[in-house]
Amino acid sequence: MAGATGVVTDIIGVVLNAKFPEDQTPEIYNALEIRLENGKRLVAEVQQQLGGGVVKAVAMSSTDGMRRGVKAIDTGRPIAVPVGPGTLGRVFDVLGDPIDGEGPVQATEYRPIHRPPPALEDQSTTAQIFETGIKVIDLIAPFTRGGKTGIFGGAGVGKTVVIQELIANVAKEQSGFSVFAGVGERSREGNDLIHEMKEARIDEQTRVFDKTVMVFGQMNEPPGARLRVALTAMTMAEYFRDEGRDVLLFIDNIFRFVQAGSEVSALLGRMPSQVGYQPTLGTEMGELQERITSTKKGSITSMQAVYVPADDYTDPAPATVFSHLDATITLERSIAAKGIYPAVDPLASTSRILDPNIVGAEHYRVAREVQRVLQRYKDLQDIIAILGVEELSDDDKLTVARARKIERFFSQPFTVAQQFTGRPGKYVPIAETVKSFARLLAGEVDHIPEQFFLLQGGLDDVIQAYEASRR
């Protein structure tokens, strides 16, 4: 009940118990406001009703310096965050408070972060390709406009860099609105991303940042904030979708959302499930993923980085995410070890729309032929390791040579990695990608050594680099 006042009776880490009059017990997911002695406001979300007017709540910020006996006020509704054009070009925390030092947000509407997904009859599914400008993704695992894509990888294989490049490409080439949720990742990366977005420009007047909303709940935040920050970003994205816009939602990293849920679950005293995860893992993931959907008014296209613990794809966290996705981009450590970035595994990455009726017969033919050549090269590796390349048939030697060129040609200079590679980023349209790989498969560049294919845009760049070296 709004305005009901209770008293904090127990504090265990970020979980606290508060006692209210029994006929005024706050509802599940209601936000409680607590004024600390230092004048700061602490918000906690009700998770359990224990009976007798006692509720268990999870704090959204640190409980340091909090004492038993302080007053807790029931706001009567879930955490509500600002939505609308005033949020563009701003940086928020889980509560929707600006953290960029730019003053109060100009918002006329606030929405609760817990909302039902759109009704089934309002949802819309399209099978339209979404161009990213990244060759390996556009050819092998094309994104669906209004679909969900997961970027899977272990530690340090380049998930965040791929996400950052997608943000930069999409903002420049597609001129849509983007919402970025930093969930439990490094504050340094978040800071770098904000500065890069401010520097990148769509045109003379408009920065990429001016069309982006950023919401952060980083590694140092309590688990409650990390668990709810994705819902805050989702609520802001839903507003633009419902206004008829096409929105991009980036989540880095969805595994940290699961990890925060696991921490909260343990603090609430729930019995853990397999590998120590929360028993509600599937439900929590479903509640978030079902809201990331397109309606007849507008679309939300989402790209989610998924950390894979110890490179184990059978771990319950990445396995639960898999079932919700239209396309999966798998980053492989062995490819990164060869110095090929983005380290996408073209044999393990998949897309629902790699279908001749959607992408076209030529795109489908080239993609499948590239995969066939790479698979044959993979099958031959044991023979090569034992007997050497010289013992292969002429056909197999040609397959190996082309496969090695394809592997290297899948690498690409990124705009956001310019300071590492020393090369300006390249955006390659899908038509050029398909044409370049078709020419490579046809044997047009069999005479060019494989090292010239590394970190190039289109095939013409490879030919130019080769001819320049011969002068």
Curated annotation (Swiss-Prot):
The answer to keyword Transmembrane helix applying to this record is: no
Q: Does the keyword Zinc apply?
A: no
Q: Where in the cell is it found?
A: Cell membrane
Which Pfam family is one of this chain's hits? ATP-synt_VA_C
Membrane topology designation = Peripheral membrane protein
Q: Which GO terms describe its cellular component?
A: plasma membrane; proton-transporting ATP synthase complex
- Group of enzyme by EC: translocase
Enzyme Commission number(s) from the entry:
7.1.2.2
Q: List the disulfide bonds.
A: none
- Keyword entries, A-Z: ATP synthesis, ATP-binding, Cell membrane, CF(1), Hydrogen ion transport, Ion transport, Membrane, Nucleotide-binding, Translocase, Transport
Can you state which reaction this protein catalyses?
Answer: ATP + H2O + 4 H(+)(in) = ADP + phosphate + 5 H(+)(out)
Binding, ATP: G153, G154, A155, G156, V157, G158, K159, T160
Q: What does this protein do?
A: Produces ATP from ADP in the presence of a proton gradient across the membrane. The catalytic sites are hosted primarily by the beta subunits.
Subunit record text: F-type ATPases have 2 components, CF(1) - the catalytic core - and CF(0) - the membrane proton channel. CF(1) has five subunits: alpha(3), beta(3), gamma(1), delta(1), epsilon(1). CF(0) has four main subunits: a(1), b(1), b'(1) and c(9-12).
Name listed for the protein in its UniProt record: ATP synthase subunit beta
Organism of origin: Roseiflexus sp. (strain RS-1)
Q: What is the lineage of its organism?
A: Bacteria, Bacillati, Chloroflexota, Chloroflexia, Chloroflexales
Gene name linked to the record: atpD
